[in-house]
Amino acid sequence: KLFILKRKSKLGLGSAYSDGYKWALSKNSTNNGIEYDKKYIYDNIYTMDADFSHNPKDLLRMKVFLTENGMDLVIGSRYKTGVNVVNWPIQRVLLSYFGSWYARFITRVPIMDLTSGFVGYKINVIRDIMKKGIEFNGYAYQIEMKFKAHVLNYKLYEIPIIFTDRTKGESKMNKSIIPEAVFGLLKMKLKNVFSRL
């Protein structure tokens, strides 16, 4: 079945993800809103681009690692085996690749593609991250989700994918995301460090 969440306005990428997660978490055995200790109808949650930049066939590979190989979070990685991106201009490739490198350097999460939006989660991972709360609402949201899963000692794994850019429409990503990534990630990391002292 396909369920479509209608939102009143565009409130940011992170807000859209959070609304989707909250909807899935609300589908527990009692169907009575978000109750973090209930049994959920959905075992896993997957996020992906709806323009087929992410190949739906790769969902099956993700599922194997979540259900059979003991992983808690599986990332469709553009950079695990090099740079596997089709139809991106070089400046977009560089922004994404070095953005992931910077995020990895700051967070120390051993993942090559921390900015990937093609991710499979066990639902308890989403539950525990949502309990802690999410700070970012832009593209850094993706990094924060993986960082917090890592901090919570969940098992993260990357599978290589080929990302093919859309043939119609335009990406909303631009250089305005850089300040959030540069300064926001530093703040997030420092906050985590001092919370453990």
Task: Name what the model sees in each region.
Residues 20, 51, 122, 149, ...:
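Residue-level signature of catalytic and energy-coupling elements of molecular machines
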